């Protein structure tokens, strides 16, 4: 179902020029990984999924969306899994860590600007990557952020950064490691956004 939906969306997006993807070779080919991409609307979630095909991403989605049996069933088929955003706890990271250890890809979408939600999400991406012993890949998207904007002119650009590897931070104590990796992620995402402005 995931592959079918992603390829169908790829065809639809191609009608407006498609998605230009830069540095796709930065995606790890030999392990699962966390990909943290800038977020301004639902379009960037779709763009990331289409842009890195044939890789398939597992997404976090708020648990309320799964309360409807049919919607919940569809979301599971396209690799979404429920998370309690109001009361996040240890159970919120069990699923993504398990997926990483199975060699799968987990997508997390901190916003592009430093909002109150942004820093915890980046820290969450780092925590999941560390506990899953997986690389953390920064990414940035630039283009339409809503369905209304999607059918207007304007490029859709996605850029993939070089992965952050756990080994590069292993010399630090655990608390410092979390802070250092979060700051490194933030810095790389900023650099990617600046590069997109020039492309």
From Swiss-Prot:
Pathway: Lipid metabolism; phospholipid metabolism
Record-listed E.C. numbers: 2.3.1.n4
Keyword Lipid biosynthesis: yes
Catalyses which reaction(s): a fatty acyl-[ACP] + a 1-acyl-sn-glycero-3-phosphate = a 1,2-diacyl-sn-glycero-3-phosphate + holo-[ACP]
Pfam family, one: Acyltransferase
Recorded GO MF terms: 1-acylglycerol-3-phosphate O-acyltransferase activity
Main location per the UniProt record: membrane
Keywords: Acyltransferase, Cell membrane, Lipid biosynthesis, Lipid metabolism, Membrane, Phospholipid biosynthesis, Phospholipid metabolism, Transferase
One of the GO biological process terms: phosphatidic acid biosynthetic process
Protein's cellular compartments: Cell membrane
Any single Gene Ontology cellular-component annotation: plasma membrane
Motif (HXXXXD motif): 39-44
CDD domains membership: LPLAT_AGPAT-like
Knockout consequences: Cells lacking this gene cease to produce phospholipid and accumulate fatty acids arising from the dephosphorylation of 1-acylglycerol-3-P.
PANTHER family in the cross-refs: 1-ACYL-SN-GLYCEROL-3-PHOSPHATE ACYLTRANSFERASE
Protein family per UniProt: Belongs to the 1-acyl-sn-glycerol-3-phosphate acyltransferase family.
Function: Converts lysophosphatidic acid (LPA) into phosphatidic acid (PA) by incorporating an acyl moiety at the 2 position. This enzyme utilizes acyl-ACP as fatty acyl donor, but not acyl-CoA.
The record's note on its domains: The HXXXXD motif is essential for acyltransferase activity and may constitute the binding site for the phosphate moiety of the glycerol-3-phosphate.
The protein, known as: 1-acyl-sn-glycerol-3-phosphate acyltransferase
Upper lineage: Bacteria, Bacillati, Bacillota, Bacilli, Bacillales
